[in-house]
């Protein structure tokens, strides 16, 4: 990560990050530690000691078990929660019941722990997959259904208990260390370019690509914000094509052997980050060309 462009005016922590061992979680935990915050990572399985972010505490627990989360938050005097723990699209498709337990019950558990302990800062990941689309005007997969439910649950939780949460809808977050998930192909293509290897992105089309540095800054700013009602927002309205991604890679590595399969993925429709802009104002965007450069250089280091 480059130098952090944002430093909160007041301490945010201790910050509890559920799912903090994943790609986005690691980047956020690293940034929080660099800011001097106290950070507790809650995951079903903590990473090996050598893979942990120095300065952060790691605790194992099951997001489906509210008592696990409550114990950790109470023991560490948590002041903010970033809820990232979730099963992604393939896992939800393979085991819908488990997907609902982790993604929906887990979300309810995190909200209830925040309520019980008087924690007022609560930021969580939703997804563009929550947006209705297609002939049925519904999310296209169960992961999106679960995320849409979490958005509505958060709004009702505010009506019942007054917790003004912030839900963020990323689309494709890329950067070094992103090697898992359907859209990790963007990062994997950049890794291949850095290593001089061939790689075919298994789809084409247009999407919202955001470098992890930009997304981390948005999360930090949201943690420092004080909304008076629940906020749900897309992160960006910028849409680029896979051809744009390939061009950005070749601008850094002209010899790169990267391509895309002719399997089209539809571009997201109706995206709107006005709620986020109204809450935060501006932040430091990372254009695709710059994000590709950072990612390729990091993979090549």
Across the structure, where does each feature detected by a protein language model lie?
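Conserved Rossmann-fold NAD(P)-dependent oxidoreductase catalytic core, especially the SDR/UDP-sugar
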Residues: 101, 105-144
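NAD(P)-dependent short-chain dehydrogenase/reductase
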Residues: 142, 155-207, 212-214
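Rossmann-fold cofactor-recognition segment
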Residues: 54-65
């Amino acid at each position: 990560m480059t130098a952090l462009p944002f430093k909160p005016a007041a301490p945010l922590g201790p910050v509890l990050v559920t799912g903090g061992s994943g790609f986005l979680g690691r980047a956020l935990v690293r940034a929080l530690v660099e800011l001097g915050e106290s950070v507790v990572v809650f995951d079903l399985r903590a990473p090996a000691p050598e893979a942990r972010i120095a300065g952060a505490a790691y605790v194992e627990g099951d997001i489906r078990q509210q008592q696990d989360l409550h114990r950790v938050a109470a023991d560490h005097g948590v002041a903010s929660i970033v809820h990232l723990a979730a099963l992604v699209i393939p896992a939800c498709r393979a085991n819908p019941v488990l997907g609902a337990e982790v993604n929906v019950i887990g979300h309810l558990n995190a909200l209830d722990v925040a309520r019980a302990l008087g924690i007022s800062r609560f930021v969580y990941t939703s997804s563009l997959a929550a947006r209705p689309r297609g002939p049925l005007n519904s999310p296209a997969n169960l992961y999106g259904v679960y995320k849409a439910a979490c958005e509505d649950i958060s709004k009702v939780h505010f009506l019942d208990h007054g917790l003004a949460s912030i839900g963020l809808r990323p689309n494709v977050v890329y950067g070094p260390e992103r090697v898992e998930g359907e859209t990790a192909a963007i990062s994997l293509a950049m890794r291949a370019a850095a290593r001089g290897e061939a790689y075919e992105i298994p789809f084409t089309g247009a999407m919202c690509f955001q470098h992890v540095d930009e997304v981390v800054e948005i999360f930090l700013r949201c943690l420092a914000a004080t909304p008076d009602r629940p906020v749900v927002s897309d992160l960006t309205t910028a849409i680029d094509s896979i051809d744009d991604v390939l061009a950005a890679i070749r601008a850094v590595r002209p010899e790169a052997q990267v391509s895309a399969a002719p399997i089209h993925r539809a571009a997201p429709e109706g995206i709107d980050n006005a709620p986020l802009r109204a809450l935060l104002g501006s932040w430091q965007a990372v254009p695709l060309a710059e994000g590709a450069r950072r990612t390729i250089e990091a993979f090549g280091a």
